UniProtKB/Swiss-Prot annotation:
It is an enzyme of class 4 (lyase). This is 3-dehydroquinate synthase. It comes from Picrophilus torridus (strain ATCC 700027 / DSM 9790 / JCM 10055 / NBRC 100828 / KAW 2/3). Its cofactor is NAD(+); Co(2+); Zn(2+). One of its GO terms (molecular function) is nucleotide binding. Belongs to the sugar phosphate cyclases superfamily. Dehydroquinate synthase family. The gene is aroB. SUPFAM superfamilies: Dehydroquinate synthase-like (SSF56796). The lineage of its organism: Archaea, Methanobacteriati, Thermoplasmatota, Thermoplasmata, Thermoplasmatales.
Amino acid sequence: MDLKYKLGNDVIRIVTGKNILKDFACELNSGGNISIISRNVYKKYDLSFIKNRIIIDDGERAKSMEYLTLIINELLNKRVERGDSIIYIGGGTTGDLSGFAASIYKRGMGLIAVPTTLLAQVDSSIGGKNGINYMNIKNLIGTFYNPKLIIDDISFIDDKKLMMDGLAESLKMGITIEPELFNIINNDPDYIIENIERIITLSINAKLSIVSKDFHDKKHLRYVLNFGHTIGHALESYFNNNISHGEAVANGMIIEAYISKCLGNADISNEIRSIIKRLGFKIIDFRSVDINRLLEYIKNDKKSESGYINIVAVNGIGRYKIEALSPEEMLKILGGMP
């Protein structure tokens, strides 16, 4: 796939394929361009053809003032100009930090994205959001800033656990926005792997269909992209981040589909549970969860407004609406979870 999309005021080129990164070696090494590379990715893959590089740690620790300052200092020391580009090669945290640095250095320089996880390829690299954490608050400081080029090299996707995290996000979009995506993922693992490039393309198109109408996230149209995340983020906090994002979102989708049913929508919670189980996600035994403590995390969700909790309620595949619940209503429904 080699297509161009308009997003906000920008035109973004997205190229998807296998073993394609070296095809862009000249562009990546052009002028004062500098690559910010995840340490894990740099250790695992031969990226010696990339000449001008900064290696950073993985994970939320890198999304900090410390690492931002390190990058800005390197850009200054290497006399990087505004017309040059930052290239990031890594997962979502590498992209968040690099995108923010590109957006503020000399009021904005070029940005090229090379997401190396399925999660980053189908989700975090699309939509322009970036940021760093501050005072233990996630993504407190950030901007909306698009890459001019996204290179989705599927040869990086060779870790089963990381692939599952990405499939959870693709399934989310298949349930709410793109039924064809749902139908592909609702298959055996071999079929899914054979169709991974198609999954990436459909996921990108699904997300772009939403963010292109609400680039700066002002109209609440992006709410649908949070299906499974209101509960999922709460589960991550509840378990002290000892479960992966994909596992949290997968379980969040099961629970939010159950909530949807309780609100009078079509019951697809068992269908979603079956797919998630087949994908290999661990399904949380909700009977062992302290509902009151979980509710406290749910109430902290950034999409909550005026004391009400906003949920993406699914009403069949490809159909959804936003429902607002009081904490008392949420507690009552969660208390009845099987």
